[in-house]
């Protein structure tokens, strides 16, 4: 099997299967002294490559030599640097002009090695041996060669034709399935632009291809996965698709080698595809992006009126059939690309960098039909048209550019109703039926897929996809399918297929069929149909919610027939469903419609007429109304069946004519139509003032002059219910000449429209209101009150904010409002900047008329544009609320207050809100009167209301413990969390909770025991929440404050208020391998000294239960002051204790980590990809560390294993890469450092374990894993403490000893030296802190600033805080505003920065004692007016105090203080008791800055007492910080605490906090706070 394909006049492309010997013969036929085989290390592992190499060596000509060069794999190595290394190798080996280079590999190798050949010795011969499908059909052919640059891919290269391209299909046997499928994009592309026959052949073989490619055998060799795909079984198909694709490219290249015109046709799908690829790489592959690009560019061709909707549908279908994405929003593709956004402006910017472009004009290849491009080169397209195609939100501009004499003919697509019925009838019928004008839409796509899945008929296509051919087997081949039948939002398909499923036969593996759909489909009713089928012997289960999909239809039950009664007042489709399947029942069927007049009876008559066309005649009962008699039998398929155009869809172009005063003709719908909606023109538009001409087969409408439509007083639209939406938008601008008239159009007979894709009546009322149109909802209809003038139509808005028209994912809502949107401002003169109307979710029109927007734009002349989704803009401003759920006594009340304080949110207790709404007592009173069921119903209603109104408004909702008892409340919780809201499950030890609840008399008693309640609710709490916090019972004030700080950090982190910042400096984390952290809480602070994070090794915990693990995380948070946590589950093969194959438990643990909001998760790169991407897509604000360990020391640092793992980590877009090797010698550390230097794309933790590897831990730059002297054993071989690392690094010259001083006078009792030297000692730093006593700033400058080369910094105290400023080159904001410097920071080159950390001492003292980081809405108090008072005012302003009250013994200084600060600080001096009494604000924080060595002034004390009383209504305990270090309890502290129950913080804390701030600023590392505090405060 070998075919030679000519290109540029020579047969240099050879295509075969298993042609290894031919490849070698062909290469050695190129006479040379030197052959150089270049490949990457991945290809080098493939057995077929080794065989090729062996053959090459065996056949090497005498006197010739074979050289080999292996490059690192991946796009990251397709660089000028790699090219240079290859060239240096060739030169070092003495290669000359006669060298033949053989490039064996995929596109990266082919491109780069081709470029090497093009430039080495000014050009040497090259042979391409492509090993991937993409390389075989694309990159290896045509002579394009290149390398990447930091600014873009393939920017530097040359055209250099290879001597041969030797394609051996057998290589594909070892290709990973995703790479295989990726290559199919280029194969489909070439068929699409050039070869219609090959495209049709590809359509036919898609299923078998995907089955084979999806089921490879996978083996592992040295940690590398080897694929073995059974391409032998589809060899002919694979060979043909590769060959035909190559032929197309070869022909095009031969005609246009340098890509001046024709060759750029090969870029179909690439203009848009490359733009997506630029954003989504490396997660998305080239072919995947090109696949999306092809669909978008085909849609653009359709939008411009060039390509038919059928052809777009074919292209989309074949791409899906071969496993490729057709939209970036497909769930699997979105998860694969980690939910990356593709902003519209970014896409257009990326598209502007394209070699096809004409300067700034963007060019795109357009498609005329499958197999043929439009023209011979790419075409210029406008940004406006591109924006439209690239987005799902449409801007409709005023229709003021439509000529009033415009006369258009519009042919709508085939009827959805008739299309779906025809497919069912033909699938059940016997014989071949050619169905023409079938609607190509989402609905029919789902129906066709279902027919194929159920083996109902053989389906093929003719007339280039315009005709579908069904070869029916009379229903005998219907069998249960393996997969669920997913029907999207296709209501018609779901109802028809429910009855079809009743006729399906079981297989040996399956005895049921599952029918399911999207979220909306799972809300739409199907109960009456199910009830009738159940009563007739069919066993059907509701999988989820009663009365809705998903359904489980058991195929071992029998459709008995006989009399069937059906309630048909909701949907006529129930009737049609049973009618069409009735002939196949065991007995003749009598179908009686009960419950009142059936809805949409014309659709029932349509079904009966169609059944007659297929050979079954239904008789109407002569004795019972609405009763039908269906005989037993089989359908006989007519040879041809032509689908009539959709009459519902025809209403839109006809209404366009009515609204714009133009003429539109629909040529194939008239009075003889099967469809009731054909009456729309005569029954609705004509009475409203339109001129209507209708024949048996056509309808023409001419509208009156714009603004002259008349309201329709009453119309019964029961025969054409789907058309009522169109009537509503026409009625919106219809008015009488009477200015007192309400211009009311009344529409009735449409009750069924409430249960369509959405509640359409409610939808029209809601959306019309946005335009300023009033409506009334009727029991079975709607009243629309038309505007007096068309100029009164408003651009939709809520308040002053423009909003989009919501379409509810409903095609008819979208198409209707696309018409009204264009009438807004349509009578205004053309404006250079008109305001368009935004329509959301435009793609929903694909359900019945995918090309509607194209018709509106291209045929009817509307100006449309695309726009970035509103949600991207609104989400930035939204403050997603927090709902806290959990059992009573879980701490919800307390923690809800903390939550509100931490976020600055408003707090609402839902139980309290219920009681306020109830107004007659407490919840227990309501329950006593109405019962629990009614309470849950009302509770859910109120909850729904608050979420709808305040879910994005920054609230904390504290819920009752039983909120989750209601299924409706659970649905709301899940929906809220899915939309980005925070549902926090708060829990604690259940045994302690039970003990507490048994003593609580304040709530209504439960009938069940509390434990049973917990057992029932536990799973609900977990299912409904997206975050979880374990709140242990606190036994002391210290534990309580620790818990508060831990929770505050947790809630601020998960909500994104504070971010997890990856350190950019030298940093470390300590590894904890305890079985239970509870036993070590007192030592955890000491263990974590100097660390920037703490790792909990979950694989070492004694219990893997979710609650236990959650408790461990909370304990760790509270015991380490919220130090960032690294959550690690280390598997055995990666050096841990967790079982390697227990992936289910591992995934649960990782999801638990995300729910408890850990800062980092260590994610092993060897885990299954499904687990990895689940975590990556759920991570929110958690950072991911992609880790890989080589305990066996199997791979030196220059081995490709590390390169592959690094590329894998990049593709996963982890936040940090962590690689750990095992050093055998010191040289291993040097190799590691070379690796570190060349891999800087992501933050990298790279170390060697073992005694030889210790130096690598010292040299590692960020987050080095460390142990502690307080731990009994190390977590890994060779671990060092922070102090050991610093000491070794100092000895190596990495840290230079610095001297620090406290300057001022008197400083004899200063605790600064003790403070700082303790920190240096604990952390192993070489620095020293001393005293320099002086009252002269000049002395400080002379002896320290000018002459101390190793000066590390100065702590400045009185009297120098002002005098030192003149010697500072820079001042921080705090130093400027406070007007004093207490910290000097050397900048180098004899320059210094002045800072003030006194304010941080105050702020951090408050925050560490329970005050939120933001106290927005509260006020503060400062006692005193000296220098420290200025720091206090600055601190309270930074905390967010809305007002700062100041009091002092002498009032003169108060005015000076007020003038000192900017006006926005809102400082209010209090001088008299009356002023203090008049204060209405809540004071939550205070700082005392008056000296403590003398009694408190009486007047000052009186003022202070009055102000301390103003502390109610805070979400935290009001807190006062004392600035004086001694005594430990001052008079102000005693007053505040004992008399007014304020929390007081002694001055020692402020002293230490400000000193620690200095320490961390100077040394750029975390200070050991507790050790320092203990040293400073010891007597």
Swiss-Prot record:
Pathway(s) it belongs to: Metabolic intermediate biosynthesis; chorismate biosynthesis; chorismate from D-erythrose 4-phosphate and phosphoenolpyruvate: step 2/7; Metabolic intermediate biosynthesis; chorismate biosynthesis; chorismate from D-erythrose 4-phosphate and phosphoenolpyruvate: step 3/7; Metabolic intermediate biosynthesis; chorismate biosynthesis; chorismate from D-erythrose 4-phosphate and phosphoenolpyruvate: step 4/7; Metabolic intermediate biosynthesis; chorismate biosynthesis; chorismate from D-erythrose 4-phosphate and phosphoenolpyruvate: step 5/7
EC number per UniProt: 4.2.3.4, 2.5.1.19, 2.7.1.71, 4.2.1.10
InterPro entries named in the record: 3-dehydroquinate_DH_AS (IPR018508), Aldolase_TIM (IPR013785), Aminoacid_DH-like_N_sf (IPR046346), DHQ_synth_AroB (IPR016037), DHQS/DOIS_N (IPR030960), DHQS_C (IPR056179), DHquinase_I (IPR001381), Enolpyruvate_Tfrase_dom (IPR001986)
Places the protein is found: Cytoplasm
Span list, region 3-dehydroquinase: 1072-1284
UniProt keyword Chloroplast, yes or no: no
Ranges for region 3-dehydroquinate synthase: 1-383
Residues given in the record as ATP binding sites: 886-893
GO terms (BP aspect): amino acid biosynthetic process; aromatic amino acid family biosynthetic process; chorismate biosynthetic process
Residues reported in the UniProt entry to bind 7-phospho-2-dehydro-3-deoxy-D-arabino-heptonate: 122, 138, 144, 154, 186-189, 249, 263-267, 270, 286, 355
Shikimate dehydrogenase: annotated segments: 1297-1579
Catalytic activity: 7-phospho-2-dehydro-3-deoxy-D-arabino-heptonate = 3-dehydroquinate + phosphate; 3-dehydroquinate = 3-dehydroshikimate + H2O; shikimate + NADP(+) = 3-dehydroshikimate + NADPH + H(+); shikimate + ATP = 3-phosphoshikimate + ADP + H(+)
Stretch list, region EPSP synthase: 396-862
Catalytic residues (UniProt): 259, 274, 844, 1189, 1218
Amino-acid positions noted as binding Zn(2+) in the UniProt annotation, renumbered to this chain: 186, 270, 286
CC annotations in GO: cytoplasm
Keyword field: Amino-acid biosynthesis, Aromatic amino acid biosynthesis, ATP-binding, Cytoplasm, Kinase, Lyase, Metal-binding, Multifunctional enzyme, NADP, Nucleotide-binding, Oxidoreductase, Transferase, Zinc
Cofactor binding comment, as recorded: Binds 2 Zn(2+) ions per subunit.
Sequence similarity: In the N-terminal section; belongs to the sugar phosphate cyclases superfamily. Dehydroquinate synthase family.
HAMAP family registered for this protein in UniProt: EPSP_synth, Pentafunct_AroM, Shikimate_kinase
Described purpose of this protein according to its UniProt entry: The AROM polypeptide catalyzes 5 consecutive enzymatic reactions in prechorismate polyaromatic amino acid biosynthesis.
Name the UniProt record assigns to this protein: Pentafunctional AROM polypeptide
Upper lineage: Eukaryota, Fungi, Dikarya, Ascomycota, Saccharomycotina
Gene of this entry: ARO1
